Amino acid sequence: MELIFLGTSAGVPTRTRNVTAILLNLQHPTQAGLWLFDCGEGTQHQMLNTAFNPGKLDRIFISHLHGDHLFGLPGLLCSRSMAGNAQPLTIYGPKGIREFTETALRLSGSWTDYPLEIVEITAGEILNDGLRKVTAFALEHPLECYGYRIEEHDKPGALDASALKAAGVKPGPLFQDLKAGKTVTLNDGRVINGADFLAPATPGKSVAIFGDTAPCASAITLAKGVDVMVHEATLDTSMEEKANSRGHSSTRQAAQLAHNAEVGQLIITHVSSRYDDRGCQRLLAECQAIFPATALAHDFAVFTV
């Protein structure tokens, strides 16, 4: 998987950072997919500066209905129709996402010429496509807000064809069942368990993408043990009380959560527009003092999971 940050600013854009939007390129050899997490104003314009086509998006996950995470959605939906050949799209988000989307399209005389499904979610598993699952966790913010945990299923180990041949099992249709870990009966009556001839499974990758939040009880479960955690760091540690009062987190709190949840890497984003480049580096240093494996996202930054 690959994360591409299209916008990393909190609340309003700056000259160098747009508001929140993150692409997740699934990069699966047999079932590719392009997912978008949040869609702040100008997201479709940001995508023009990447190699990715909005028409290829197949799922959009909205964390909450604040404008800096949402106002780019109607325009993106319409542009997909104007460009043509857009594939079916499913939007996930909190209660109100359907009314917002349908009202924006209706009042502007707009429409979509591709299948569009809107799913209003609650906390819990919201998607399992056989290759990965997505679980939504309620966060602490003035509006109903969610974070998303994306987990690939473990990849089955390779079938040891040499060992099977040594056991007298010839290559053929049975190999598919054995590769799936099934038990098969040979013509001579022998019973072969495919699991005995498989290499260990490769653990799937996992990502936790937080919406806006103050520290909350669900955060540790959302992030526990993931390879990459994407979390807001709206304000520095000295402004922690102000951040929390508005449903946001400080650098220290993001880093401490990453440490407690034992994640592989922390990527901080959603940085207040009050910070220039030097200020952003100070935010990064505050996080790294607690959790060294921290990176600071900037617009168009790409991270491999």
Curated annotation (Swiss-Prot):
GO molecular function: 3'-tRNA processing endoribonuclease activity; exonuclease activity; zinc ion binding
Quaternary structure annotation from Swiss-Prot or TrEMBL: Homodimer.
Organism name: Citrobacter koseri (strain ATCC BAA-895 / CDC 4225-83 / SGSC4696)
The organism's place on the tree of life at top rank: Bacteria
EC number: 3.1.-.-
Biological role stated in the UniProt entry: Zinc phosphodiesterase, which has both exoribonuclease and endoribonuclease activities.
Cofactor requirement: Zn(2+)
The UniProt record lists the keyword Hydrolase: yes
Cofactor annotation remark: Binds 2 Zn(2+) ions.
Positions annotated to bind Zn(2+) 1: H64, H66, H141, D212
Protein name: Ribonuclease BN
List of catalytic residues: D68
Keywords tagged on the record: Endonuclease, Exonuclease, Hydrolase, Metal-binding, Nuclease, tRNA processing, Zinc
One Pfam assignment: Lactamase_B_2
Classification via HAMAP family: RNase_Z_BN
Record keyword Nucleus present: no
Binding site for Zn(2+) 2: D68, H69, D212, H270
UniProt family annotation: Belongs to the RNase Z family. RNase BN subfamily.
